[in-house]
Amino acid sequence: MPESSISPSADPRDVESIDAIITAAYESISGPAGAKRNWHRERSLYYPGARLIPTGSPAEPHALAPNVLDVDGFIARVEPYFAEQGFYEKEIARRTEQFGRIAHVWSTYESRHKPDDPEPFMRGINSIHLFHDGSRWWIVNIYWQQENAEHAIPEKYL
């Protein structure tokens, strides 16, 4: 699928601050099984050409490698899963560094199938790069790795 060079217009409240855009990113992918996500909202958060980069290997969990996706590639990857499974992801800790119009956020997350599940089925860390164009924040890329037995989340990220 060809990559769009133009992102849809965003709700100004979603992109007015780093807090707002991170919240919108988590909210846009969360919902019950079978519920259509607001992909317009999701796309509106990302700078044209942005990348979403999960680190892992479904076949071999110990052979980690980045899987570089554009926004539409990410949506195509997760839609079948979201059709069958509830997915609620929320941020549980954050470290932010900013210089001028660029920012880096370490965002620790946990995922549940239902919002009231007592324990998450997954946790991990997102490395999020952001850019402010003078009027709004954009996500340039999100690069993440799930926690596993070999790679527990360090205390400094909790």
Task: Please place each PLM-identified region on the residue numbering.
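Short structured motifs
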Residues: 8, 89-93, 125
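Short, low-complexity N-terminal intrinsically disordered segments enriched in polar/charged residues
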Residues: 1-45, 158
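Hydrophobic pocket/interface hotspot
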Residues: 25, 42, 50, 105, ...
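Extended, well-structured beta-strand/loop surface patches
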Residues: 103, 114-120, 153-154, 158
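Short beta-strand segments enriched in hydrophobic/aromatic residues
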Residues: 29, 46, 109-111, 143-146
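Short beta-strand edge/turn micro-motifs at domain boundaries
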Residues: 2, 116, 123-153
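Surface-exposed, charged secondary-structure patches
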Residues: 51-52, 56-116
